[in-house]
């Protein structure tokens, strides 16, 4: 008599799934955490809502209205979720039939697009970016048949560069009436002039992902947003959980999106950009660094000689970076979150020692 294990009972695609390797899941015992693109210091908030015996609103009014005002869109064009990662999954659940439809994304890029699709049983198609990490529009066009959702991260994680806006327009024309184009703007606060939020009126099939995890310094809150036209938002509302944000999360998010909160966020952005330029300049003078790539974000991608040895050496010293060697076209690359000046100096000193 054959014995069926619990694993045997699981869906085949889940048994075969490689989970997303988040910074926390990868672990480490460091005191300089530069692997998750977080803000380096905590921002303090005081809870003002104490009615924790009641369920929260599905879409907290203050959060939606504050974010709409900040993003320059209508409240009806905003959906708030448990991080932008939930937004990624909601779009697949709303628009893709498992076993029939596909998503498309352009590596090297963020890993959750594929994990979300594979979990649901939706095909993933990839069109690697060009050598300059811009979109291969011909390659995308050739693979669009059957694709319902296209994910484009801009600024792109982990490369740090913006996607050419004209290429975005071409992509939106290629997909009109065929697929949803999702612009992942998790890092847009570091280059706000590049946001596509103003394009929503022109492109009904455009959706934009945002988060409070980066410039707003609230990675531990798990609060993200999807900006889209009302028809898209209404469909997402059909598949979202009934209470995606807890009352404390909604309380803090509303405070972070107040006029004072926006001012504080922009001050943090200015500080991070200044520190980024300092770190880029220093990295370019270190001999174990082969190349430092331009960045529009709060992290820097660099290519190293003997990157695995460098990564381990810094890891052993408590400096935790993000290894990108397994990403397409990123052999020898490590990603470094921009931290405090003290943290930058720890990295610089450790890398200089690698030259000996």
From Swiss-Prot:
Pfam families: Aminotran_1_2. GO terms for molecular function: histidinol-phosphate transaminase activity; pyridoxal phosphate binding. GO terms for biological process: L-histidine biosynthetic process. It comes from the Bacteria. Gene3D superfamilies: Aspartate Aminotransferase, domain 1, Type I PLP-dependent aspartate aminotransferase-like (Major domain). The modification N6-(pyridoxal phosphate)lysine is found at residue 214. PROSITE patterns: AA_TRANSFER_CLASS_2. Keywords: Amino-acid biosynthesis, Aminotransferase, Histidine biosynthesis, Pyridoxal phosphate, Transferase. Its EC number is 2.6.1.9. InterPro entries: Aminotrans_II_pyridoxalP_BS (IPR001917), Aminotransferase_I/II_large (IPR004839), HisP_aminotrans (IPR005861), PyrdxlP-dep_Trfase (IPR015424), PyrdxlP-dep_Trfase_major (IPR015421), PyrdxlP-dep_Trfase_small (IPR015422). CDD domains: AAT_like. Pathway: Amino-acid biosynthesis; L-histidine biosynthesis; L-histidine from 5-phospho-alpha-D-ribose 1-diphosphate: step 7/9. Its cofactor is pyridoxal 5'-phosphate. It catalyses: L-histidinol phosphate + 2-oxoglutarate = 3-(imidazol-4-yl)-2-oxopropyl phosphate + L-glutamate. Belongs to the class-II pyridoxal-phosphate-dependent aminotransferase family. Histidinol-phosphate aminotransferase subfamily. Homodimer. PANTHER family: HISTIDINOL-PHOSPHATE AMINOTRANSFERASE, HISTIDINOL-PHOSPHATE AMINOTRANSFERASE-RELATED. This is Histidinol-phosphate aminotransferase. It comes from Shigella dysenteriae serotype 1 (strain Sd197).
